[in-house]
Regions:
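Sec-exported extracytoplasmic/periplasmic mature domains
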Residues: 101, 105-110, 122-123, 172-176, ...
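N-terminal Lys/Arg-rich, disordered targeting/topogenic segments
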Residues: 1-2
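Surface-exposed ligand/attachment interfaces on beta-rich extracellular proteins
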Residues: 186-190
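Noncatalytic regulatory segments and standalone regulatory/sensor domains
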Residues: 171-172, 195, 214-227, 233-276
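A mature extracytoplasmic/lumenal domain signature
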Residues: 100, 182-184, 204-208, 237-239, ...
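Loop/turn elements at helix/coil->beta-strand transitions in domains of secreted/extracellular proteins
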Residues: 196-200
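Mid-length scaffold segments of soluble, non-membrane domains
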Residues: 162-163, 167-180
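Active-site-adjacent structural segments surrounding the nucleophilic cysteine of cysteine proteases
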Residues: 6-10, 15-164, 206, 213-219, ...
Length: 276
């Protein structure tokens, strides 16, 4: 297994400038990413005591009023939910999507190696057609195949990744027939699924970096939105303000603010696979 230094997207550079956030550590942005040891709790409201009730001689139900009016209770704050999804590290340079899938399957007791899962992604090894300013004009279709070399470089680029239809197909093939996937998921839907105990694989940028986005035309004509920091992780928990991330880049687990997550999530058109 490769070290964290050798794994995917540890350091990205455009024009010689390091992309801050692409290697975001737990000591940076403490208000954004919380360690998994941080706890969350919801206060339990105290309800007023009910008044006594009786029946008078006329057969009419009477109620003894309480000493204070009963207030209208606010909607309860959602509790923090964590899902015991195993944390794995990607075993190849660019197989983050495969490793995130492996985590989702393992939660349901389905143990499949990354190499076996990756074999089902039918990598398209044709090189890209590059344009000006280090942009990609033409390349493969990650909606149908893994694009490029899995142990290549996503900056050169000689390798890229794979998108939700391939991951969904593999999830169903290996024992989760009710898994669903797609794009355009509202963040509220993702949070509801997590609250229900369903791990969710999402597409973001590495360490939630903010980097330029582009689009290439696949060999079959499909328009592909891409980023040189494309990454995939498994969400394994939700609180009123944050989501918990199982990050296969270096087998870490941490919390990130919902607002920060939602910005990154939108970069790949709210792409997700829900494991259920």
């Amino acid at each position: 297994m490769r070290s964290a230094v050798a794994t995917r997207r540890r350091f990205l550079a455009i024009g010689g400038v390091a992309l801050a956030g692409a290697v975001l550590s737990r000591s940076i942005g403490a208000e954004i990413i919380k360690d998994v040891s941080a706890g969350f709790g919801a206060a339990t409201p105290t309800l007023p005591s009910p008044g006594g009730a009786g029946i008078n001689s006329a057969g009419v139900t009477t109620t003894t009023p309480t000493s204070t009016p009963t207030p209208t209770m606010p909607a309860p704050t959602p509790a923090t939910v964590t899902i015991p999804v195993p944390v794995f590290q990607q075993s190849m340079v660019l197989d983050c999507e495969t490793a995130a899938l492996q985590q989702g399957l393992a939660y349901y007791g389905i143990n499949v190696s990354q190499s076996q899962l990756f074999a089902g992604e039918s990598a398209d090894l044709r090189p890209p057609v590059m344009g000006p300013n280090h942009t990609v004009l033409r390349w493969g279709n990650p909606y149908t195949n893994f694009v490029g070399y899995v142990n290549g470089s996503d900056w050169t680029p000689t390798g890229f990744g794979v998108y939700w239809p391939v991951i969904l197909r593999l999830a169903r093939t290996y024992g989760l027939p009710n898994a669903i996937g797609g794009e355009g998921f509202a963040p509220s839907r993702i949070y509801s699924e997590l609250a229900a105990g369903h791990p969710v694989q999402v597409w973001i940028e590495t360490r939630f970096a903010r980097v330029p986005l582009g689009a290439w035309t696949a060999w079959d004509g499909t328009q592909i939105r891409y980023s040189y920091a494309e990454h995939s992780v498994t969400l394994s928990g939700v609180s009123p303000t944050q989501v918990r991330v199982n990050d296969v880049l270096n087998a870490s687990q941490y919390w990130v603010d919902k607002a920060f997550f939602e910005t990154n999530f939108a970069d790949f058109n709210n792409m997700a696979v829900i494991f259920q």
